[in-house]
Amino acid sequence: VDAVGTACMLHSNIAAQYQSLRADFFAQPGVTRMTAAEHTEGDSRGTGAVGMVDAAAFRKNAGLKREVFGPFTLLVTCEDQEDLTRTLAGIEGQLTATLLGNEAEIQSASALVALLSEKVGRLLVNGVPTGVEVCPGMQHGGPYPATTDSRFTSVGTDAVKRWIRPLSFQNFPGGVLPPALKDDNPLGILRMVNGKMTTDPI
């Protein structure tokens, strides 16, 4: 990680907040700093950092469960599967979680999958969550405090639903309906009619 160098962050204030939180994490009891690279004061660039702590210390310290927005990783070491389960049960909502393993290993971890499904908005296998594609299948949200409303995504086709609400027009004459609802479909858009998606006029 030290050899990677720095990267420009989104804003100088974000870089300053990252530096502050990173320093605070490394000052916590039981946290071992695994990287040596330092951050340059006043610079908008972020330096990657890795810390390590054992699961018992992590569970006792709520401050270690905060998000550090930037190139920071905290490795939490667990003694066994029970220790891992206890630790994950105590974390709050997250945007993502990744499981690393082959198919047989993932199948044997069904209880872990079920636990993580309650904690995150996107669950990955052998992948990294940094690729946030704008597509219908993308879910970039999660239980609080990852987001304030876990029913929505902030990226992807469904993200627009954060800003709209359903409205039904019942028994309206066709001439006064909005264009998107007119029988002849003047906009040529895809609509659900009698349970089927179609662009055909009614």
Give the location of each predicted region:
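NAD(P)-dependent aldehyde/semialdehyde dehydrogenase
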Residues: 1-95
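Serine/threonine-rich low-complexity intrinsically disordered regions
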Residues: 2, 28, 35, 102, ...
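Generic surface-pattern signal
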Residues: 2, 6, 23-30, 118-121, ...
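Generic signal for short, ordered secondary-structure residues
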Residues: 4, 63, 142-143, 186
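C-terminal core of ALDH-fold dehydrogenases
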Residues: 41-43, 81, 86-177, 197-199
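Extended hydrophobic packing segments that form well-structured cores
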Residues: 177-202
